[in-house]
Amino acid sequence: MTRHFFGDTAVLLGRSLRHITRSPDTIITTAIMPIAMMLMFVYVFGGAINTGSVSYVNYLLPGILLITVASGIAYTAFRLFIDMKGGIFERFQSMPIARSSVLWAHVLTSLVANSISLVVVVLVALLMGFRSAAGVPAWLAVAGILILFTLALTWLAVIPGLSAKSVEGASAFSYPLIFLPFLSSAFVPTDTMPGLVRAFAEHQPVTSIVNAIRALFTQQPVGADIWIALAWCVGILIVTFAFAMNTYHRKIS
């Protein structure tokens, strides 16, 4: 059974990746908005924001990476919705394949596509002056956090992808996720925010994830932020996975 699951997932993953390679505009579109935001904030607003001794592009990049992921998962919900409405799921049910492999293929496709978009954003940031003296372990830690964050949000995307009534509804859920970094330490230090906004910003998941990635990039002590970030990512992943699988089983039953 396990062997069939991995084999079926690999085949379906190949199918999804072929769709992406035939329309690379998906990845380009995902990366364009975060890159445009990075350009605007660095070159238009960056001079007015005090981030201490850290250059603004270095300060900003962790938040932009999270926005890139939040933008990318909308396409996961979109692809799931199209497959669901197109009868692909019913066709797969009539075949001798592991049922959960269909969802895992979409999730892994999201992970691959978002990883490519993240690399593109980092390359643009390097052209804009981003520099990090972080070693290989720190970069691997950043990659691990981003992978967990992507998986958590992708399983969240599965839920509207399966249950939405329209294609617009399937992808619209990502809008609040894209907005969330604006109420965090992603763009400005939280100590510059008004009381209630600051309280919210300091206790929502994006701030701890951004702070952990920023500390890793700048080789500063990560403190408790990395554990809080991991707890948020793992917690969201567990909850969204459970809800997504429940939604999927209800849909195919």
Question: Which ranges hold each PLM region?
Answer:
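Short, membrane-interfacial amphipathic segments enriched in basic
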Residues: 1-13, 153, 196-207
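Aromatic- and glycine-rich beta-strand/loop motifs that create alpha-glucan
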Residues: 1-33
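Membrane-interfacial helix-loop-helix junctions in multi-pass membrane proteins
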Residues: 19, 50-51, 133, 184-239
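Transmembrane helix segments
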Residues: 41-48, 161-203, 207
